[in-house]
From Swiss-Prot:
GO MF terms, alphabetically ordered: Hsp70 protein binding; identical protein binding; molecular adaptor activity
Biological process, per Gene Ontology: post-translational protein targeting to endoplasmic reticulum membrane; protein heterooligomerization; protein homooligomerization
In-chain residues carrying the UniProt-annotated modification Phosphoserine: S293, S295, S297
Top-level lineage group: Eukaryota
TPR repeat start and end residues: 15-49, 85-118, 119-152, 153-186
Similarity-based family: Belongs to the SGT family.
TM segment ranges: none
PROSITE patterns for this protein: TPR (PS50005), TPR_REGION (PS50293)
PANTHER family, per the entry: LD24721P (PTHR45831), SMALL GLUTAMINE-RICH TETRATRICOPEPTIDE REPEAT-CONTAINING PROTEIN BETA (PTHR45831:SF1)
Coiled-coil region list: none
Protein name: Small glutamine-rich tetratricopeptide repeat-containing protein beta
Amino acid sequence: MSSIKHLVYAVIRFLREQSQMDTYTSDEQESLEVAIQCLETVFKISPEDTHLAVSQPLTEMFTSSFCKNDVLPLSNSVPEDVGKADQLKDEGNNHMKEENYAAAVDCYTQAIELDPNNAVYYCNRAAAQSKLGHYTDAIKDCEKAIAIDSKYSKAYGRMGLALTALNKFEEAVTSYQKALDLDPENDSYKSNLKIAEQKLREVSSPTGTGLSFDMASLINNPAFISMAASLMQNPQVQQLMSGMMTNAIGGPAAGVGGLTDLSSLIQAGQQFAQQIQQQNPELIEQLRNHIRSRSFSSSAEEHS
């Protein structure tokens, strides 16, 4: 019964981790919580029973077991096959340089058939799958590469890219952290980890955290409301709004006057921005930080 409790504890731990992810609806998260409570009741296990924890997470145990049963024994690969597989890998690499990703996948697949215990072939195929937008297949290939070589940092890094593309930011952070543990000086892993962590913060909070811009706080800010009211009392703005309403209900065309209205609107907007800068500069700085943050994320993703 002790071994069964270890297994159930691992399952409960996995379900609890899943219930805390934002990929599920509130109803689905509630169902996971019910499942956890049922298992704890039936097997008389509580979160305090940490002595039942195993060293390896359930997902890693499953991946390792699955991949061991999914690939052929190493003894089935003969030297001739290994040599041919390496040639196919080189062909696949050339296809990648030429951006012929489908052909690259085909070459790596043939290499795997000849030498199924080479982690590099799975990892390279994962890169090609990601280029084709086949992120789920890329993750599977990375998992197989890791099962063969658990210290293969590049496999963790490429799995992080695929997970990020699927908006699985929490798992992506874990993958990048493992990649950095194995290759601490890799700037690409550091950059991509920061991006994944930032994305995770953004999706974890409705109003955003860190450098994210809180529009609700801006709109509800008393100083902002006061300045907006002052702007609407500006005679130029009132005249502009009156002219716009006249045109909207079929009045005379704007003509040259329309250009004057536009100039007045720009001038009023500039005055409003100056008032915010003078009376509440932290709001302007928050907006600037938000724009800088978005620009950094876009640039980093494009060069990952």
